[in-house]
UniProtKB/Swiss-Prot annotation:
Pfam families: DAHP_synth_1. GO terms for cellular component: cytoplasm. Disulfide bonds: none annotated. GO terms for biological process: keto-3-deoxy-D-manno-octulosonic acid biosynthetic process. Its EC number is 2.5.1.55. Belongs to the KdsA family. The keyword Transferase applies. This is 2-dehydro-3-deoxyphosphooctonate aldolase. One of its GO terms (molecular function) is 3-deoxy-8-phosphooctulonate synthase activity. It catalyses: D-arabinose 5-phosphate + phosphoenolpyruvate + H2O = 3-deoxy-alpha-D-manno-2-octulosonate-8-phosphate + phosphate. It comes from the Bacteria. The gene is kdsA. Pathway: Carbohydrate biosynthesis; 3-deoxy-D-manno-octulosonate biosynthesis; 3-deoxy-D-manno-octulosonate from D-ribulose 5-phosphate: step 2/3; Bacterial outer membrane biogenesis; lipopolysaccharide biosynthesis. It is found in: Cytoplasm.
């Protein structure tokens, strides 16, 4: 299958195009922090010439502990998203967890995300598809890459072909994830754009008993490896104070490192996509 290109305004999302950054923060902690992070991303990506989509969650409905911070909720979250969109002229991506959230969220954001833990929930898939929005499907940690075709088929049957596939690691025993680089290449064979969530792939699920641990010291190495595959995009989360972030701080990139980090990722992407394909199957 040929590479599918998804048009998001002036941004082209495809495996054979310059990579798109899907980045921001894990969960909305406050309006001011969200604006600060969005401004930093906007400035850095504009300087480096990287197409950019702002990401944050309004509700983390799948936290390990009932006492963990979840976010401001949909109503307040959408207000913050609207302000970010109008202030910085940025497209937006966020996740939904329930059927009733799909339509109102799709009125504000450009891409709605299907969480990995919910990727086989047919009613949610159908509701998302019917919004007509671009969809980002997080590959579940428990599914093989080739099984993503079943999720794609559900969206297609519900009338939506604007699909992005996102790798975020696979379960490797207890409290650990690994990334199958060949699995991302296998998903690329579908023709749909494939992006790599390089920060969530650093998770150690349940590694801190009541919350996820992580390995942000290896954020650069893992992302470089993924970008060497020639992907449609990179998905990352950053925070000005990762040690005190309200969710997934151990995986978050320190915000002050963003420009250096993205400079390297762009260099890898540019280099890999300058190569002529080699068919080693023959």
């Amino acid at each position: 299958m040929s590479n599918k290109t998804i048009d998001l305004g002036s941004i082209e999302i495809a495996n054979d195009k310059p990579f798109v950054l899907f980045g921001g923060m894990n969960v909305l902690e406050s309006r001011d922090l969200a604006m600060q992070i969005a401004e930093t991303y906007a400035e850095v990506t504009q300087k480096l010439g990287i197409p950019y989509v702002f990401k944050a969650s309004f509700d983390k409905a799948n936290r390990s502990s009932v006492n963990s911070y979840r976010g401001p909720g949909m109503e307040e979250g959408l207000k913050i998203f609207e302000e970010i969109k109008s202030t910085f002229n940025l497209p937006l991506i966020t996740d939904v967890h329930e059927v009733h959230q799909c339509a109102p969220v799709a009125e504000v954001v450009d891409i709605i995300q299907l969480p990995a833990f919910l990727a086989r929930q047919t009613d949610l898939v159908v509701a998302m598809a019917k919004t007509g929005a671009i969809i980002n499907v997080k590959k579940p940690q428990f599914l093989a890459p080739h099984e993503m075709r079943h999720i794609i088929s559900k969206f297609n049957e519900a009338g939506n072909d604007e699909i992005i596939l996102c790798e975020r690691g696979s379960s490797f025993g207890y409290n650990n994830l690994v990334v199958d680089m060949l699995g991302m290449d296998e998903m690329k064979q579908s023709g749909y754009p494939v992006i790599f969530d390089a920060t969530h792939a650093l998770q150690k699920p349940g590694g801190r008993s009541d919350s996820a641990g992580g390995r942000r010291a290896q954020a650069t190495e893992l992302a470089r490896s993924g970008m060497a595959l020639g992907l449609a995009g990179l998905f990352i989360e950053a925070h000005p104070d990762p040690d005190n972030a309200k969710c997934d701080g151990p995986c978050a990139l320190p915000l002050h490192q963003l420009e250096n980090y993205l400079t390297q990722m762009k260099a890898v992407d540019d280099l890999v996509k300058s190569f002529a394909p080699i068919d080693t199957s023959k």
